[in-house]
Amino acid sequence: MGERQAVKVAILGTGNIGTDLMYKLLRNPGHMELAMFAGIDPQSEGIARAKKLGIPTSYEGIKAVLDDPEIRIVFDATSAKAHVRHAKMLREAGKIAIDLTPAARGPYVVPPVNLGAHLDKDNVNLITCGGQATIPLVFAVSRVVPVRYAEIVSTVASKSAGPGTRQNIDEFTFTTAHGLEAIGGAEQGKAIIILNPAEPPIIMRNTVYVIPANEEFDQAAIVASVDQMVAEVQQYVPGYRLKDAPVFDRRRTPWGERTIIAMLLEVEGAGDFLPPYSGNLDIMTAAAWRVGELFAQHLLGIRQEVAA
C-alpha cells in the first residue's frame, strides 16, 4: 500500500466547536492532516488538550495559520464578526476557508444537497446548526414538489449554547431562513431557535413545516425522498433521525387551505468531545469534517460523487 495522501488543514477557534472538530479529525483524518490548532486565548482548554495530543498549537490566531504556506484548508470556528476579517486574509493567502460561523462570505453548503457545485470556491459557509439539520429535509420535499413556505424551529439544550452561539442568535435566524430558500428551495423561509434550560439537557430537536406550492404531489414520493435524504445525512451524522414519518395535514394558511407537511427531527451528538446532547454543535463539526474531506479529495485529484 502507498503512503496516505493528505492535505494539511488548520482549525481556527479553540472553543467547543473547534475542539470537537479536532477530535473528529484525529478519529478519522481521511485525506486531511491537522497541522495547526490556533486561537487567541492562552488559557484555552482546547489548546491544552491539543498540546497533550501532540498537535501544533498557537494562541496567535490567524497569524499562525497564515505563517504556514503548506496549510491548504482552514476551518474557521471563531465568530461571524471575526470571520469577516479572516475571509479576506485567507483568500489573499490562497487558502480555502470552511466557515462554521454565520458570516456567510462564501456560498452556503449542505453536504448531501449542493457541495459538489462549490468545490472550486475558496470560501464556503456551513450556515448554522439548524440549517444543517433542516435544509436537507426541505430540499427533499422541494425536489418532488415546489415549496411555497418552510418554517423550522430548532430547540437546543441551553448548556450546549456557548457565548459564540448566544452572540450569533440574530445571524442564526436570518442565515437559516435564507438557507431554507437558497438551498432548500422554499419561496419563503423562517427560522426560530429556542434555548431550553431543562435538566438533564435535551438533545437537539427540530420541527420542520413545509407548505407545497400546489396540491399536485405524491405523498409516497415525498416520504421516499425524505427517507433517502435522512440516510445520506446519517453517513456523517449517525445520530440524525426522524422521530416518525412525515405528517400530511390540511390546515388554513395565509395562502388558503393547504396541506402542511410536518417533520420531527432529532440530532444526537457522537460524543467525540462534546456530550451527546450537543447534537446542534455535533452536526456542524460533522458537516465541516465532511466538507473538508471532499475538498481535500478534490485538491488531491481523487474522483468523487457529490451532490451538486
Swiss-Prot record:
Pfam families per record: AcetDehyd-dimer, Semialdhyde_dh
Q: Which Gene3D superfamilies does this one have?
A: Dihydrodipicolinate Reductase, domain 2, NAD(P)-binding Rossmann-like Domain
Q: Which reaction does it catalyse?
A: acetaldehyde + NAD(+) + CoA = acetyl-CoA + NADH + H(+)
CDD domains xref list: ALDH_C
Q: Does the keyword Thylakoid apply?
A: no
Please name the GO terms of the biological process aspect recorded for this protein, alphabetically: catabolic process
Give one GO molecular function term. Answer: acetaldehyde dehydrogenase (acetylating) activity
In the UniProt entry, which residues are flagged as the active site?
129
* InterPro entries given in the database record: Acetaldehyde_dehydrogenase, Acetylaldehyde_DH_C, NAD(P)-bd_dom_sf, Semialdehyde_DH_NAD-bd
Q: What is its EC number?
A: 1.2.1.10
List positions binding NAD(+).
14-17, 160-168, 280
- Which terms are listed as keywords in the entry? Aromatic hydrocarbons catabolism, NAD, Oxidoreductase
Q: Which family does it belong to?
A: Belongs to the acetaldehyde dehydrogenase family.
Q: What is this protein called?
A: Acetaldehyde dehydrogenase
